[in-house]
Amino acid sequence: MKAEIIAVGTEILTGQIVNTNAQFLSEKLAEIGVDVYFQTAVGDNEVRLLSLLEIASQRSSLVILTGGLGPTEDDLTKQTLAKFLGKALVFDPQAQEKLDIFFALRPDYARTPNNERQAQIVEGAIPLPNETGLAVGGKLEVDGVTYVVLPGPPSELKPMVLNQLLPKLMTGSKLYSRVLRFFGIGESQLVTILADLIDNQIDPTLAPYAKTGEVTLRLSTKASSQEEANQALDILENQILDCQTFEGISLRDFCYGYGEETSLASIVVEELKRQGKTIAAAESLTAGLFQATVANFSGASSIFKGGFVTYSLEEKSRMLDIPAKNLEEHGVVSEFTAQKMAEQARSKTQSDFGISLTGVAGPDSLEGHPVGTVFIGLAQEQGTEVIKVNIGGRSRADVRHIAVMHAFNLVRKALLSD
């Protein structure tokens, strides 16, 4: 089924409201295996809507119109659709009864002829009751094309779609998706590596999305059951993860989790809990962002003992007992400083892990290091590891955010190696 969504309303074209209905409908239709090919917005104008209906009827098998079902003069969606199909408007008894009750309970409200429009549907249509409003929707098939009219307010449209429309559109297959999350590899490199899979995809499909500091891959397939979908998605996932970077590194090393809501931080916090281990932090450029991120998760007190925010050289020396002369000799942005910060954070809190971040957030360089230079240290019983990352060409906020992601990834790898 090839679907098209037509949003009716001049206020959409003038930017007075955002057309969130199209996004909601596209998402829900995809979940039941209906592909949306076109989204269009048109003003409250009969001539232009008639023209658009003519185009839609030639290229789509499902045409959904949203908005324009109200009582005002510019609410003309049902009237225009009826004219296009050569049909009359008739009253839906249930909607008319609801309208009668509404005005009976509000004797001060004036009931005008325009109000009656809300209880009308195109002749032959299946009514779609409105749970939260007065304007009834409808579904009608003519010459192989299914037409649907829905109210514009999201509070009315959403329950009508979920409870009335989708059950009537259900087919034998649904769309199932799986999201893979990658860190440490850019979107362009990932897309290049997966070029053959992307170019030759039919079903299942994969689509990359770049986010701040990471990349996600959405794998989707149409299937009649979750079990059938899992089989197809498992095959595609393994094909993806078996690929290697140009340096010969498996993509499995970059894939850290699944799902829309998963994050590096959530993975690390849960793994620390599972292993019964604790962590402490000493932060300079990130000014407590790592610690605040850990504290966002419930039960963080079981794995997070505490930490230090040591922005200046003096505080690094005073709070972490690192000799000032050594800091001056090596610089606050250095492998040495990151190592000592991590080790002292671990030692002073008696934690299993000590993590440190020191670097240049910008906008100016520091100690000869360009903006985006970050040293991250991880101290544990086996020793201390320090990595240097370059997060160039980013805003100050992004440098700090991505630096924290690198820190969580370093901890994640250490936990996996235990």
From Swiss-Prot:
Database matches in Gene3D superfamilies: 3.30.70.2860, CinA-like, MoaB/Mog-like domain
Pfam families in UniProt: CinA, CinA_KH, MoCF_biosynth
Top-rank lineage group of the source organism: Bacteria
Family designation: Belongs to the CinA family.
PANTHER family: NICOTINAMIDE-NUCLEOTIDE AMIDOHYDROLASE PNCC, NMN AMIDOHYDROLASE-LIKE PROTEIN YFAY
Record protein name field: Putative competence-damage inducible protein
Species per Swiss-Prot/TrEMBL record: Streptococcus pneumoniae (strain ATCC 700669 / Spain 23F-1)
